[in-house]
């Protein structure tokens, strides 16, 4: 798109020393590159800025720096920031977003997923520290959120196990990110077909969202508030830094 309004789409390309970062976060970067290639000749409602951030694992340094360099005009012209982090391993595929009306990226993604029969859900709110539909500030969406920019966030994990904070990715092996198991060989052996399925679905979803997201055409209906159904289950602890 050539609009003065923009959507920032980002994924961090660094990883921790353990493993090789196949899930966290080569998977996110791969989907960003795929969607950028698909959309490069397609007209979109807004201009799209694709970014690979560095140093996420050491305090969100790349995204913090980028956000700190944005002018007031840049901030005003940014419709949303969409973050992709750790898409390959988790038992379930999720989309999160800002609370209330600013959660339009999440809401559109869920509507799109329902229409296309894609297996995408959102955080059900089992842990009251992370209300339904939202997530924590542990990834590259956080610096933009602090600027008041609405966010969307794609991730694969499992919010219904462990401490109910989205940190325990799988029932079979717990968390894979930040461990020596975060390699393509391990993931494909233990979860055959999951990488291909997840990255394909996330690519389709993100492409459709970026092609169709237009706030002028998506103004909320009067006197109706979209609510995300919360699940009911006790929780233990809150999620630590990702």
Regions inferred by a protein language model and the residue ranges of each:
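Short beta-strand-to-loop junctions in surface cap/lid or active-site-entrance loops
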Residues: 1-3
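Extracytoplasmic/secreted envelope proteins and their assembly/folding machinery
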Residues: 6, 10, 29, 33-36, ...
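Flexible glycine/proline-enriched surface loops and loop-helix/loop-strand junctions
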Residues: 15-17, 87-94, 126-128, 137-138, ...
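Metal-dependent peptidase/peptidase-like ectodomains
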Residues: 43, 53-153, 158
């Amino acid at each position: 798109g050539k609009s003065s309004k923009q959507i920032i789409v980002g994924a961090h390309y660094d990883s921790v020393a353990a493993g090789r970062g196949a899930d966290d976060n080569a998977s996110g970067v791969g989907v960003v590159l795929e969607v950028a290639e698909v959309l490069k000749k397609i007209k979109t409602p807004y201009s799209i800025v694709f970014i690979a951030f560095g140093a996420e694992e050491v305090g969100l340094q790349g995204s913090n720096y980028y956000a700190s360099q944005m002018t007031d005009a840049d901030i005003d012209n940014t419709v949303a920031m969409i973050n992709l982090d750790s898409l390959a391993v988790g038992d379930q595929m999720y989309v999160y977003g800002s609370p209330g009306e600013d959660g339009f990226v999440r809401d559109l993604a869920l509507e799109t997923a329902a229409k296309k029969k894609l297996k995408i859900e959102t955080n059900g709110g089992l842990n009251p520290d992370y209300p339904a539909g939202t997530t924590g500030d542990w990834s590259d969406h956080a610096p933009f959120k602090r600027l008041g920019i609405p966010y969307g966030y794609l991730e694969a994990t499992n919010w219904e196990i462990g401490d109910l904070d989205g940190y325990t990715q799988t029932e079979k092996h717990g968390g894979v990110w930040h461990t020596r198991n975060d390699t393509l060989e391990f993931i494909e052996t233990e979860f055959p077909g999951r990488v291909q399925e997840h990255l394909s679905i996330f690519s389709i979803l993100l492409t459709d969202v970026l092609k169709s997201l237009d706030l002028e055409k998506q103004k909320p209906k009067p006197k109706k508030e979209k609510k995300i159904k919360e699940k009911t289950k006790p929780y233990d602890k809150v999620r630590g830094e990702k």
